[in-house]
């Protein structure tokens, strides 16, 4: 008797739609989507990311990762009547790119009945990212890429937005790919001890810092895209025009090439770091936080990195 080898390994009824190279699992559309939702629930429980009555701010850019996380957290939140969540979006001011993302983020929030808050670089800092890039080029200052400036400014903007809405947690859609890229990026920059701070859930070290959680930290980026496709979630597919200039992009390409040949490499990197993280934390000096003398936000220096960058731009 001939057996059908293309049947879902979970339900044993429906035709398989996707095969996970790192585990060998074959899954139908329904079981695949449920496996992603289950993985998020497991990750939240594993790292004790949430309390039953938390107010969560979800960072929503409009891309596949953030809108997928928004939909999954909305589903989970239904089981916790005392919990609540809002979406926060940062408008960096990237012409021809961010406008579409803002519309998509707003559309997803409206569909889910989630309040949507938007903060902009222009309003917070007086500059759009486009203006920053133009200003730096005119000055001949190209030591840092646009992504380096955007990363620092965006991180501060998200924290301020989450604090403004009185959130207990700030959920970001960093995937397994993002986490492994960051690990290698820190090593390439000679800052291996920084890995100790880049955890799935951050330590609360200052009253002005909203604790960050990463429910997608063990989900590959490819699978968040597939989840959005299966659940028919609208997202922006066009990449940021500045992304190609960053070292992170080179690391992404390298990791994807290795993963293609050696499935499971990204998980191995992530799990290895999780094992040695306690030792790294013991080695890393606990940096005391103070308030920036210019903007009042938490920083390890007298003047925070954002204000240092804005000085350079001005």
Where are these regions (language model features)?
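ATP-dependent adenylation/nucleotidyltransferase module used to activate substrates
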Residues: 1-185, 189-197, 218-231, 304
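Flexible helical/loop "lid" subdomain adjacent to adenine-nucleotide binding pockets
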Residues: 45, 55, 169, 180-224, ...
